[in-house]
């Protein structure tokens, strides 16, 4: 991709990781490490609520070597990330999926997703939506709309305890697998 943002190209393909406010976000470092192992450089954009303690911002910044973004920059500020070669949304919440599908770009995270789909940048999503919210008609319609735009989805994850009482693991690397398929 050309450098639409004027900040120079990364030496490796650049991955935007959009993090939403779900409990599993605390382990987003696993995705960053897996992406680096697969040859990606990453930058993280978080929803404002996710910035409120859902993950360790300092740890993520140390892993990526870049600031975590959640607010728009002012016009004179340099762009902190190069243009994305791909985007991963993990965990993707009910709220973010619905706002994105409706084009409600009221946060940097959702605006970034709207731009990425508009520009044809590959996007992989790992939904993390509660069982009580997943059947809502708006959510199903949003998934259909985003799939129609070429967005790739992993299996849904609720975070609910299984029969044995433990939570199943969140498949962070599945997002990277989704980006590798044609």
Which residues does each predicted region cover?
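A cross-family phosphate/adenosyl-ligand binding-site feature
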Residues: 1-182
């Amino acid at each position: 991709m050309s450098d639409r943002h004027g900040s120079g190209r990364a030496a490796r393909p650049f991955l935007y990781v959009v993090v939403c406010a779900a409990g599993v976000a605390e382990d987003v470092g696993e995705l960053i490490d897996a992406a680096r192992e697969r040859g990606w450089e990453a930058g993280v954009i978080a929803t404002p609520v996710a910035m409120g303690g859902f993950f360790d911002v300092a740890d993520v910044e140390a892993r990526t070597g870049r600031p975590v973004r959640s607010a728009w920059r002012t016009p004179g500020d340099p762009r902190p990330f190069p243009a994305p070669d791909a985007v991963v949304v993990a965990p993707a919440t009910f709220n973010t999926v619905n706002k994105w599908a409706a084009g409600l770009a009221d946060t940097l995270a959702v605006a970034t997703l709207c731009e990425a789909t508009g520009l044809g940048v590959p996007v992989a999503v790992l939904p993390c939506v509660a069982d009580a919210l997943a059947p809502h008609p708006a959510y199903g319609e949003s998934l259909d709309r985003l799939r129609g735009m070429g967005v790739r989805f992993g299996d849904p994850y609720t975070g609910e305890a299984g029969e044995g009482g433990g939570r199943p693991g969140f498949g962070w690397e599945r997002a990277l697998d989704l980006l590798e398929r044609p």
